[in-house]
Structures are given as C-alpha cells and as structure tokens.
A protein has these predicted regions:
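Short juxtamembrane loops and helix-capping segments at transmembrane helix boundaries
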Residues: 39, 44-53, 191-200, 263-271, ...
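Small-residue-rich transmembrane alpha-helices
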Residues: 31, 254, 334-401, 442
C-alpha cells in the first residue's frame, strides 16, 4: 500500500495539470449531482414522512368545469360520519392569516407575528403529531394552541412552553397546550400555530367552501367505493339552504392519496407546493449524465497520459512487477483521485449553501439533512473511479515493452479507437445538455419579454381566497 501511495504522489507531482483538471471536473460533477438529487429527493419524499402515509387522503370536490381543493364544513362532517373505515377526519382553514401577539419571558415582553391555522382536534391524529411535551388532546379545549418545537424555543428558550400564554393587545390570550416535533419542509403540515376551530364556524353553511379536508383510513384499500357509499346514504334533508344540491352540480369527490397531492395541478385554491414527475425524471437523468461526462473525461485524460506513463509501467514489469498488481495500483490510483474529488465536491456543496444558489433549491441543502444521499454519492464516486480507471489500467499493462520502441500507444489504432469513442460519447452528452439548456433559456426569455399589448407594470393581479369570496 505504501508503494501505491508513493506512486500516486509521484503521479500528482508529475502530471499536475491533468490531475487538477480531473479533480476539478469530478468535484464540480459530484457537487452538481448532489444538489440536483437534493431537489429530486425533496419532491419524491414530499408528504411521505408520516406514520402510515398511504392511509392519509385529501378529499377534493370535482365539478364538470374543474375541481377545487376546498369543501364546505357540513358536507365534510357528513362524509366523516359515513364510513367506519374513516379512523379520523379533519378540516383545516389555511386562510386565517397571521396572529400578532406578545410573549413575556423573564420580565421582558417580545412581540411576534406567526401564522395560525384553525383545525379540528383530530388534525393531530390524521397526521400523527409527535409531541415533545404537553397533552395530545390539548386542542379539545378552547383558547389552547399547539406550537412547533422550533417556535417554542424561539419564544421561551429551553424552558417548558406548556402553560405559557400568547397575549394580545385587547387583553385576550391563548395558552400553549402542547409542543410538537417540527415537520420537514417537504410536508403539507406547516410548522405554525394550530388552534381548535370554532364549533359554530360555518357549521351549517353549505355555500361556504373554505376548508381543506383530510381523512385517515384504517386500510388504504378501503378507499374504493367510499364516495359512492356516502352519496347513496346521504340524506338531502340535511341541507338547510339552497346554496348546494347534488342535482345539476355534477359534483363528485376525488379521494386523493396525500403523496399525490404534490403532483396534482387540476384543482383550484390549492396551497400545496407543486412538482412534476416528468421534471423529476429529467433532473435525475441530467444528474446521471453530468457524472457520466465527468467520468468519461477522467478516462480520456488517463488514456491520454498512456504514452508518458508506459515507460514507467514497462520498467516495473522488467523489475518483476506482476501485471495484476500494476493494474490494481492504477485502478486504486483512479479511485483515490475520485474520492478526493468527491470530498472537494462536498466542500463546494457546503459553500453553495451559503450563497444565492441555496434559493434555487426548495430542499434544505445542509449535508447533515441528506446523509443517505451523501453516502450514496460516496459509493458513486468509488464506482466512477473504478470504471474510469479500469480501462486505462488494462490498456497500459496489456502491451509488450517493445511497443515503447515502436511508437506511442496514443497513436496506435486501439488507442485512437478508444479515445475517439470516449470523446464522441462525451461530446454528444455535452451538446445535448447545452442544447437543452439553450432552449429552456430561450423559452423563458420569450415568456418574460414578449410584448403582450399592454403595460404589465400598470396591471395589478389578485387571487382572492374562497373566504374572501363568501
């Protein structure tokens, strides 16, 4: 092993420029791969962090002219009671806005503004809240709220938050009843204040469609026929006004698996962040192509160095070195260079997290949040070094010493064929990425700069919530 490391250091000193280009190319490729895969991982795992995620569904109202993510409260209440397979059902009103309140700690009063969402108490059961302290049934009580752990620490430091009060200017207050573990960014559950919904709020209003409706089933297979069973046994006499009727509305319920909501784009009033499965596949392919291009570039550089290294290799053969040992040393040399590039790539990712690049990615790009991806990329770096080094290693050691006297391997037919093939694949992949990026830029430029016939700076646009329209 000492001999292998000594040879590696000798190669690094002798071929500084080639080594530098290899390390820079691979490190940039690995860092780009990690950043792209962070975004892919973020979208693929969206809303998959709950217990029995496959049993959670969002109920959406679908009409002949389109769908919407909101529903009226009495219809949701009737649906929850319609089947024994519904373990828990909840409504959430995301249109409530922010709360302005103060928290007094150690004689100092600090003012905060935080989002508050009114929900059914069963909200914590549907999404299986992990409580750090407090009573899981706290939302059953009026004027009691739940805080995420990060918010509780911001308000009260390391002291217990349960029993503390959020005070308002008019003298009213809310009491903290529980602290739950923060949810990751790629979650429909927001890390905000949760308060029990007023039991009388739109309880009999069939025309007030303001609420997001979630249910948890005892078994995801029981989703089949859930709406048909509800509609067959629904009593129209429950409808107390003329703002809603089954007849003529063409309405049905779509019971959408929660992980699919992230990719659902055909409903209105949906505040869940969106992504496209096709885009994820494209990003994944781009990440792989970037690493492949860097690996081919590494192989090509190693092959190009053959004429300058073959004398040293043949000298080792003359001195009794076995071909298998020499090949192993050459492959290990490539693997070590790839690992060094990988470590430098991690440093580039860390630096990117401190720059504006972080704003281009929805995911948290801190390496500690993606241990699995970091380890997977480490394995890919080893595989890249092995695959990029195995061909040059075998070619460098497969020719007799007489070849050194006759000419250069780099100019031999085999050498030219290998290098031409590698360069061809590399150019095709590179040009493909360049052309794709160019078309995306031109399309984006066209959408942003094409004259529309009016002055965009003088036009105001607003999208009212269902609450504003009711």
């Amino acid at each position: 092993m000492k001999t292998i490391l000594r040879n590696l250091l000798s190669v690094l000193r002798r071929f500084k420029m080639a080594t530098l280009l290899n390390v820079l190319g691979l490190s940039v490729a690995f860092s780009a791969f990690i950043l792209i895969m962070m975004q892919v991982e973020y979208d693929q795992n969206f809303d998959r962090g709950y217990t029995d995620t496959e049993s959670i569904f969002r109920v959406e109202a679908m009409f002949e002219d389109g769908g919407q993510a909101v529903i009226c409260r009495p219809l949701a209440d009737a649906f929850i009671q319609s089947s024994p397979h519904i373990v828990a059902g909840t409504l959430a009103n995301p249109w409530g806005g922010d709360l302005f309140f103060s928290v007094e700690e150690n004689g100092v009063r600090n003012t905060f503004k935080e989002q508050c969402i009114n929900v059914y108490p069963e909200f914590t059961k549907v999404f299986d809240f992990k409580f750090q302290e407090g009573n899981p049934e706290a939302l059953q009580e009026p004027n009691v709220v739940l805080l995420p752990q990060s918010m509780a620490q911001k308000f009260f430091g390391n002291q217990s938050a349960v029993g503390k009060q959020l005070k308002f200017e008019n003298g009213d207050h809310l009491t903290v009843g529980g602290v739950y573990k923060d949810y990751p960014r790629n979650s429909s559950v927001r890390n905000c204040i949760y308060q029990k919904m007023d039991p009388k709020e739109n309880a009999q209003s069939w025309g007030n469609w303001n609420y997001i409706f979630y249910i948890r089933l005892d078994n995801p297979k029981n989703v089949e026929g859930l709406f048909e069973n509800f509609k067959a046994h629904f009593d129209p006499a429950l409808i107390k006004d003329n703002s809603f009727s089954w007849g003529g509305s063409g309405m049905t319920f779509r019971i959408n698996p929660l992980p699919d909501v992230h990719y659902t784009t055909d409903v209105k009033y949906d505040q869940t962040p969106k992504a496209s499965r096709q885009t994820l596949m494209i990003l994944f392919a781009i990440a792989i192509v970037i690493v492949v291009i860097a690996g081919i570039n590494f192989t090509n550089f190693s092959t190009a160095l053959t004429p300058m290294r073959i004398k040293s290799i043949n000298t080792q053969k003359v001195l009794g070195g076995k071909e298998s040992v020499i090949r192993f040393a050459l492959i290990l040399e490539a693997v070590l260079i790839s690992i060094i590039s990988y470590l430098l790539g991690l440093l580039l990712v860390y630096i990117a997290g401190k720059t504006e690049i972080a704003s281009l990615i929805n995911a948290d790009i801190s390496l500690s949040m993606h241990i699995g991806l970091v380890l997977a990329t480490a394995f890919i770096s080893i595989a890249t070094g092995f695959l990029a080094g195995i061909y040059p290693a075998y070619y460098m050691t497969s020719f007799p010493p007489a070849l050194v006297l006759k000419g250069s391997f780099g100019l031999s037919p085999k050498g030219r064929q290998l290098r031409n093939a590698l360069i061809g694949v590399q150019y095709v992949a590179s040009f493909g990425l360049i052309i794709g990026a160019t078309f995306m830029y031109l399309q984006n430029y066209y959408m942003q700069n094409t004259p529309l016939g009016y002055d965009k700076d003088c036009l105001l646009y607003t999208s009212p919530s269902p609450r504003d329209c009711s």
